[in-house]
């Protein structure tokens, strides 16, 4: 392939713009492909999605279903053990996590999850621990301290 041999792909340049309302010879003259009269023939004539002509629409006839527990669920700052490994302190307290932006929201309690090997003798303080995190902490000879 050379520059003087370049060609457009067959059929890629043949699409012509529809020129509506420019005479009956174009195939889209007079009513411009919109049919005769009526709301849909007007410039802003389309009805909104789910409009049923004034009848109460289906989404309002069918009752609301289900329950969402978001308002009542206990929310936590989730901290992974891997994110704690890089800090070389012996005590990883909640205050330490808030100050170092490991846990973002100070209003929420901290939950430690995940599995990583901590230096032995490290004390991790949090409000809650996952089973895997507790197992990893005990396997690496560190301590988990549950806060109230």
From Swiss-Prot:
Biased composition (Basic and acidic residues): 1-10
GO cellular component, one term: cytosolic large ribosomal subunit
InterPro entries assigned to the protein according to its UniProt record, in alphabetical order: Ribosomal_uL15 (IPR030878), Ribosomal_uL15/eL18_sf (IPR036227), Ribosomal_uL15_bac-type (IPR005749)
Keywords for the protein's UniProt record, in alphabetical order: Ribonucleoprotein, Ribosomal protein, RNA-binding, rRNA-binding
Family affiliation: Belongs to the universal ribosomal protein uL15 family.
Protein purpose: Binds to the 23S rRNA.
Oligomer status and interactors: Part of the 50S ribosomal subunit.
Name of the featured protein: Large ribosomal subunit protein uL15
Taxonomic source organism: Ureaplasma urealyticum serovar 10 (strain ATCC 33699 / Western)
